[in-house]
Amino acid sequence: MIKADLKIINGQIYNTFTRQFTAKEVAIVDGKFFQIADKLSDDFKFEDILDLKGSYVIPGLIDSHMHIESSMATPTNFSETAIRFGTTTVIADAHEIANTSGIKGLKRFMDQPSLIDTFFAIPSSVPSTNPELETTGGIIDLEEVKELLADPRIICLGEAMNFKGITSEPNSLIRKIIALCQKKRPRMPLEGHVPNISKEDLAKFIFAGILSDHTQQTPALIKEKIENGMFIQLQKKSLNKENIETIVKNHFYDYSALVTDDTMADDLINGHLNSIIKLAVKCGLPLEWAIYMTTYTPAQHMHFQDRGVIAPGKIADFVVLNNLDGFSIKNVYKRGVPIDKLSIDDEKPFASEEYHSIYVPNRSAKDFTLRVSKDLKKITANVIEIAAKGTFTKAVKKELLVKDGIVDWQKAGLALLAVQERYGKTGQLTLALVSKSINKSGAIATTWAHDHHNLMVLGTNPDSMAIAYDKVASQQGGYLVVKDKEIVANVQLPIAGIISDEPIDIIGHKLKKVRLAMKDLGYVNTNEIMSLSTLSLLVSPSIKVSDKGIFDVKTQTKIPLLLAGEE
């Protein structure tokens, strides 16, 4: 007699290798699938029987590229929400906390308890470029990488994103990190951040060892990257009919996966990887393949041999669906246990230094003005133009009026962007000009500014900017909106300036108010928060800002804000 935990009857079970649902009975022993059969024998003694009455069963969902910090929640609070939507395993690249708090903060983050299986990537690019271009709270160097490689929770190298370091600097830190990983863990996947890169530059990435990409794709990029041996992780912004048609037409299912990358709290309260599945299906991906690309292919890519399929010996993580048409989730099981019976009893607090991480000088409205020679009447400026979709920007030149030595950027319909070093290292402040952002009186301030997470303020008048700056600094981090002189929306992020200790639903409610307030100020983008928060991301094309200046992303060279003036 075989003692078994659970018997599943009257279920339609997904078979990974045929991509079909068939009526089967399932036996679970010690939290693993033991047998899947038309009818189980009488040799079992079951503790419990689950009658699904025709419901559908698929493996637990695996998210092979994501950032927990994007939810602005602790790993524990994130897991309690994500598991409800069928996500049972994630591979988290926690480079945000590494940027703010270094390896000590990263390890404390990794030690947080979780209802889901959380594996981690080595943050490969902390800082995202190099310390000469941006100031961060921590740096992940070779010694830190060696330490992390010894941790069994580390299963891949996180997205390598330093374009110049990978393609044209043989002795760069990122090249040394890649070489170390290849030596110490030769089978470990090396993840990439390869936006809009093709031909010879793409070959350089792949030759260096980078074999995956999760950035925004086009049909041509998908085809070129996969044909050159890359594994493609499709996130929300890459899901459209044209891209999905490329996957389907070329039968690229085994070389791609669906991922979340960044899911903010106001989206997470409505869904996680299941939402990506629904969108992919809406764009033309057959559901059976969407399931395949969120269970089997991510497991294979990450070299998991113990999960991703419903088969003997695999971990019994599974999702019960009411129906296939709406991908409606009835229940989720972790190692054969329904999630309503799971709990976390040993939460670990973050260190006090994570709660006191903002060290900035006092600023007033006069700090948010552009001063030039009083002899000038006009001046030409390099302006960052925001796109209405996605996070790419471009540089445009605009001629601005000057009055009494002050540049009148407001009259030109521009906003001022300020990035203040927040770690108490230099106190440096960079100013930039932005078009197609907000157009009403107010400001937005945040310490959730990828990837260096310095204090960033965008505003249309200096008084509003000073109010926003002071508030986000005094509360040790956050994301807030000031309309005129009133704070109208505010998410407090007291843990390292990027994480809240509140539940997801509360964070989500507050973040939704921030998003609406940004729209009210005139910010137009498919994802306002990511659009603003990546104005500081020096690896996202094409013009971005740090505490150390305005930079051309591809060449990593500094660009002056103001050019020639006219008297």
Swiss-Prot record:
UniProt keywords, alphabetically: Hydrolase, Manganese
Record's catalysed reaction(s): adenine + H2O + H(+) = hypoxanthine + NH4(+)
Cofactor entry: Mn(2+)
One Gene Ontology molecular-function label: adenine deaminase activity
Record carries keyword Acetylation: no
SUPFAM superfamilies given in the database record: Composite domain of metallo-dependent hydrolases (SSF51338), Metallo-dependent hydrolases (SSF51556)
Pfam families membership: Adenine_deam_C, Amidohydro_1
EC identifiers of the protein: 3.5.4.2
GO biological process per UniProt: adenine catabolic process
InterPro entries to which the protein is assigned, alphabetical: Adenine_deam, Adenine_deam_C, Amidohydro-rel, Metal-dep_hydrolase_composite, Metal_Hydrolase
PANTHER family: ADENINE DEAMINASE (PTHR11113:SF2), N-ACETYLGLUCOSAMINE-6-PHOSPHATE DEACETYLASE (PTHR11113)
Family indicated by similarity: Belongs to the metallo-dependent hydrolases superfamily. Adenine deaminase family.
Entry protein name: Adenine deaminase 2
Protein species of origin: Oenococcus oeni (strain ATCC BAA-331 / PSU-1)
Species classification: Bacteria, Bacillati, Bacillota, Bacilli, Lactobacillales
Gene: ade2
